[in-house]
Amino acid sequence: DFRFKCVFDPTDRHLRQLETPERLELMKPFFAHGGCVILGIHEPTDTAMAKMWLLTYTPKPSDAKRGLLPIDLAKDECFLLDLWTHPDYRRQAVAFTMAYELGACVDRFYPQLRWVYGYAHKDNEASRNLMELIYGMWAVQEIKEVEIGDFWVNVVPGSDTPKFGPFSKKGRHSGDGFQMPGRPRSGDM
């Protein structure tokens, strides 16, 4: 028995069950700029057991200290980060259901968004399969990431391949909203 909710406030009681006070303090600007977190709640215990952060704006360079990679988002794009499900619930299709909840959240609160970028480490086969097979995502770009401490992240300069896309200085190579890196424009997906 689960329910899902979109959270726009770092003081939400369910979000506080999953995140440290330090991270919630760091992420106040994330929420102020329109970001949200989609939470999975186990109803019998009223406990948060899954989360998915949705970045809806292009972060500033100083946001690296908040754990936000420097992604260049167009007006019709967002970035899915920090998808996590408690190990006790991973076999119950909670992450799959959250994909549909993401769609419902975007339809309701962000109708202008057309594309959702995700992120998975190359060696994280489970996340990559989830993104490709269930969410219908495909690889558009590879980067090398550097992490310092608990939160600070950045992209190793020059590691973006190909040189156009969300992690490149110029963002995606097409401004019309229909053509995405890694896919033909024919509509065959």
Tell what function each PLM region has:
Residues E145-M189:
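C-terminal "cap" of GNAT-fold acetyltransferases
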Residues D107-A120:
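Conserved GNAT acetyl-CoA-binding A-motif
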Residues F79-T85, R91-D107, L133:
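Conserved acetyl-CoA-binding loop-helix of GNAT-fold acetyltransferases
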